[in-house]
Amino acid sequence: MTTDAQKRFRELLVEARKDADLTQAELSSRLNRPQSFVSKYERGERRLDVVEFGEVARALGIDPVNFLARLYREIA
């Protein structure tokens, strides 16, 4: 079961990737992961743990604290 917060988290990650002008393949290369890693978390087939989220945020050039603050403002 996917919650609204999980869905919005994924949407914001996709938005951040697109804002960084990166494809899934380009992001996965920065992460040293297969493209399917990015695809699966963006589609909700897998969740990111906190360490993975930090790695994704760094690869996207975003501040993870600000990202989560935005998420929680939007879902409150």
Language model segments and positions:
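Short, charged recognition helix plus adjacent turn
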Residues: 3, 58, 66-76
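DNA major-groove recognition helix of helix-turn-helix/homeodomain DNA-binding modules
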Residues: 32, 51-67
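Short coil turns linking two alpha-helices in DNA-binding domains
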Residues: 23, 34-37, 63
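Short basic helix-loop element that most often maps to the first helix and adjoining turn
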Residues: 11-30, 55
